[in-house]
């Protein structure tokens, strides 16, 4: 017997309401993205899949305190444009300029609190936040700004290559491991190749390459 007229619509509306009240699983994948590369892309796809996230924020650092004293950083707006191009090619990923708009040095605890505050202002349930880091950073977690508060607020999503050792996190951290891509690429390597006028085909996603050329970054297209 067919459902009464309007019953299907009502069921869909109820489903949407339930989804709106379900706490989302949100990942924060922060980085300098100078430039974004195929390793970032592969890692983002693996994180979304392995952790079954509702969304993954590609968070562009405004002033990465670990790096800015050691080398010139490409302007934040250019790095955001490249990251935006990358995010548009990954279902479930979105770019975020939260740290750029906040200004100043980048600290993970402030970013996490801002994401939680935004959900609260929008009337959403508090999301489960997954903070993405590389395995090399795990031993340093205890030195991070307000590390104890950060450990309380997030699940750590640690990306590592399947064949590499998994260092132990300091006490108090909830850790999930994600097998990262077997890709031998880094932003610094790409910058070095481009500075020599060499090709980076296969190292940078096509959409990012197009953005680099349009914005005249790293001498691409000259």
Report each predicted region and the residues it spans.
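Nucleotidyltransferase catalytic core that binds NTPs
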Residues: 1-222
């Amino acid at each position: 017997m067919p459902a009464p007229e309007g019953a299907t619509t009502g069921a869909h509306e109820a489903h949407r309401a339930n989804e709106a009240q379900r706490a989302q699983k949100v990942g924060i994948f922060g980085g300098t993205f100078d430039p974004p590369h195929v390793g970032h892309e592969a890692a983002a796809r693996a994180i979304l899949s392995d952790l079954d996230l509702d969304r993954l924020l590609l968070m562009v650092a405004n002033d990465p305190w670990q790096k800015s004293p050691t080398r010139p950083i490409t302007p934040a707006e250019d790095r955001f444009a490249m990251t935006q191009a990358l995010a548009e090619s990954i279902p479930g990923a979105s770019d975020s300029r939260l740290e750029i708009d906040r200004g100043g040095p980048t600290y993970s605890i402030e970013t996490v609190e801002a994401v939680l505050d935004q959900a609260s202002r929008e009337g959403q349930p508090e999301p489960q936040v997954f903070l993405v880091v590389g395995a090399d950073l795990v031993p340093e977690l205890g030195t991070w700004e307000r590390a104890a508060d950060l450990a309380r607020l997030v699940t750590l999503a640690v990306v590592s290559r399947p064949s590499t050792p998994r260092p132990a996190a300091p006490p108090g951290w909830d850790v999930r491991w994600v097998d990262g891509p077997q890709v031998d690429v880094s932003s610094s390597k790409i910058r070095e190749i481009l500075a020599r006028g060499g090709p980076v085909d296969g190292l940078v996603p096509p959409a990012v390459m197009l953005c680099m050329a349009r914005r005249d970054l790293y001498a691409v297209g000259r």
